[in-house]
């Protein structure tokens, strides 16, 4: 999985010019599922996102997680994170998971997140417009295939 994590003051997703979901302070996630992703990737990503200390404490240090601040998550599916741009000028998306697998894993990912933090979603496969107010900005890229083996 490739996930772009953005710390936001607020964010919303609209579909067909109607607001579908919105959050106040928390995280906006752009979530790309790869063909080799599975339960281990979901667990790792959720654990990292929920506990990642990227919110400021009283001393201004990034020392608090989205869970600590009682924030929310807005999760948006985005297969384009798996774009292959090596050949030509048109990105290829052959490195993205097939829609059936991606949809299932995206749903499972969001269910796991929602067990930890209030989580809202876009609609998988929909044409969405996402608006946000970055906080910082703080933007982190998480790739579940690029992780240390935990002991």
From Swiss-Prot:
HAMAP family: Deacylase_Dtd. It is an enzyme of class 3 (hydrolase). It comes from the Bacteria. A motif (Gly-cisPro motif, important for rejection of L-amino acids) lies at residues 136-137. Belongs to the DTD family. GO terms for molecular function: D-tyrosyl-tRNA(Tyr) deacylase activity; Gly-tRNA(Ala) deacylase activity; Ser(Gly)-tRNA(Ala) hydrolase activity; tRNA binding. Its EC number is 3.1.1.96. It is found in: Cytoplasm. Keywords: Cytoplasm, Hydrolase, RNA-binding, tRNA-binding. This is D-aminoacyl-tRNA deacylase. The keyword GTP-binding does not apply. An aminoacyl-tRNA editing enzyme that deacylates mischarged D-aminoacyl-tRNAs. Also deacylates mischarged glycyl-tRNA(Ala), protecting cells against glycine mischarging by AlaRS. Acts via tRNA-based rather than protein-based catalysis; rejects L-amino acids rather than detecting D-amino acids in the active site. By recycling D-aminoacyl-tRNA to D-amino acids and free tRNA molecules, this enzyme counteracts the toxicity associated with the formation of D-aminoacyl-tRNA entities in vivo and helps enforce protein L-homochirality. GO terms for biological process: D-amino acid catabolic process.
